[in-house]
Amino acid sequence: MGGCAGSRRRLLDSEEEETAPEPRPPRSYHKGALWKNVMGFWLLGLCNNFSYVVMLSAAHDILSHQRASGNQSHVDPDPPPTAHNSSSRFDCNSVSTAAVLLADILPTLIIKLLAPLGLHLLPYSPRVLVSGICAAGSFILVAFSHSVGTSLCGVVLASISSGVGEVTFLSLTAFYPRAVISWWSSGTGGAGLMGALSYLGLTQAGLSPQHTLLSMLGIPALMLASYFFLLTSPEPQDPGGEEEAETSARQPLIDSETPESKPDSSSNLSLQERWTVFKGLLWYIVPLVLVYFAEYFINQGLFELLFFRNTSLNHAQQYRWYQMLYQAGVFVSRSSLHCCRIRFTWVLALLQCLNLAFLLVDVWFSFLPSIYLVFLIILYEGLLGGAAYVNTFHNIALETSDQHREFAMAAACISDTLGISLSGLLALPLHDFLCHLS
């Protein structure tokens, strides 16, 4: 059905209206609508995470340089080394890039903590508008910033955009075929790769970072267009076929205590039901927290300390390459659900923690002889993180009832954000400790 009409008729914008469950449609889901929806969710994933990734890619530059006079950005493509701790054996900024990470994640954490309690009462369209406006505001504020403090305010706007968007769109997947989850995950991985690569490529090519950030204003507009004009109205879905067989073979996360029914949203779940569902989700939430804690401790705590002086890349360029390779790994693994499915995500958490331990030892002893070995490890780190994300949400979608799925997807969003927040809090004192070593 048409995009505008679909938006006006969207079931989700009238969540407070109780309607009788409609009959299930035939198993042959309309191919045109299916492709519009999966492409819509891919674009939503891409656009939702784009500003978040760009801010992390620019973290080293944001903390290294203030805006110069005139119309030039405070971030230079190849900045001279300033405000570093010259007494340390590391090439350190005075403030860890974890500060940007915290500005980019703490607002998201607050949003995700509060979302299961009341965000579902707000229709979806206003949430999407808030997300798009905040994303655009983040690019504008950082582009025209004269100080680190103002830039961090722009980073906070990017965090609000990403947090509201992720909770909104993952909850929205409950009303569409389960295939949209893998497409959403692939889109978020694509945001990482395209965001990091675009910032790296445009600044390396000599484009003013101010103009680079302003050129990205088309991304929030694309997100709004994808939601309002590309997605079709959600309809009751019949798992059917392979998905039905796979679901029936799984152990449900919680025992169903209510008669079989499929309400249009989870807004009528009691607090007791929400707590019961959340406890069942811990089997998947805890491993994902560990995965994201380890990888973002590496990314924002160790990346700037993994500095090789015997290469043609300066410190800022090395940091950008690290971010780009990590995001490339995330994109590949978040797009791999159709090829490889992992139920026991604890294995991924263990491997990522081993990754952290190995790189932490290298920061201390500097035994890796080449930056290219670090490149490979960072690519592998991204593969683990992306696989953990997509498989966690896929497993939750399979193992929760239709009645609980919308709430479960929104509640599980806290996993990555909590892990990232903890890593940022611990990376700050580690940075200060290591950078004061003579």
Curated annotation (Swiss-Prot):
This protein's UniProt keywords: Endosome, Glycoprotein, Lipoprotein, Lysosome, Membrane, Methylation, Phosphoprotein, Prenylation, Transmembrane, Transmembrane helix, Transport
Location of this chain's protein in the cell: Lysosome membrane; Late endosome; Lysosome
Protein name: Battenin
GO cellular component, one term: synaptic vesicle
GO biological process: amyloid precursor protein catabolic process; autophagosome-lysosome fusion; glycerophospholipid biosynthetic process; glycolipid transport; Golgi to lysosome transport; intracellular water homeostasis; L-arginine transmembrane transport; learning or memory
Lipidated residues (S-farnesyl cysteine): 435
Molecular functions per Gene Ontology: glycolipid binding; sulfatide binding
Taxonomic source organism: Canis lupus familiaris
